[in-house]
């Protein structure tokens, strides 16, 4: 039998996710990146943050938060399936642009007392998007 989250549990989960994105956004801004879009969604995918690096590179950022390092921690939770969904959303987003800039895919992994920014965390080949 499937388990369903109560409205309160869902709201708490969404709040924690928004707070994690806020922390990631603040960190990336301190590193010189500028926000372009937050929570870009399309059918089949979503991107937590789209940022622009000082060199003009468009950076698609997946933000993951975990309460501990069990099961490999926050970074390990970005599975190939999740990577494919981010890549799909990125392709959709890029199709809206007149000119496609250089791009990369980063992960910001948050755990208690720790924030890791993993640049070039994955690409189309690693996610198996071409298969």
UniProtKB/Swiss-Prot annotation:
Pfam family, one: UPF0102
InterPro entries xrefs: Restrct_endonuc-II-like, tRNA_endonuc-like_dom_sf, UPF0102_YraN-like
Listed GO MF terms: nucleic acid binding
Entry-linked Gene3D superfamilies: 3.40.1350.10
Top-level taxonomic group: Bacteria
NCBIfam families: PRK12497.1-3, YraN family protein
Record family assignment: Belongs to the UPF0102 family.
Protein name (Swiss-Prot/TrEMBL): UPF0102 protein H16_A3579
Organism: Cupriavidus necator (strain ATCC 17699 / DSM 428 / KCTC 22496 / NCIMB 10442 / H16 / Stanier 337) (Ralstonia eutropha)
């Amino acid at each position: 039998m499937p388990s369903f989250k109560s409205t309160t549990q869902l709201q708490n989960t969404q709040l924690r996710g928004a707070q994690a994105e806020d922390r990631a956004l603040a960190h990336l801004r301190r590193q010189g990146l500028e926000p372009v879009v937050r929570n870009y969604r399309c059918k089949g995918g979503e991107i937590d943050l789209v940022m622009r690096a000082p060199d003009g590179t468009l950076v698609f950022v997946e933000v993951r938060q975990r309460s501990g390092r069990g099961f490999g921690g926050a970074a390990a939770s970005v599975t190939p399936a999740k990577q494919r969904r981010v890549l799909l959303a990125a392709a959709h987003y890029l199709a809206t642009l007149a000119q496609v800039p250089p791009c990369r895919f980063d992960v910001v992994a948050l755990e208690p007392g720790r924030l890791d920014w993993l640049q070039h965390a994955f690409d189309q080949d690693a996610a198996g998007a071409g298969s």
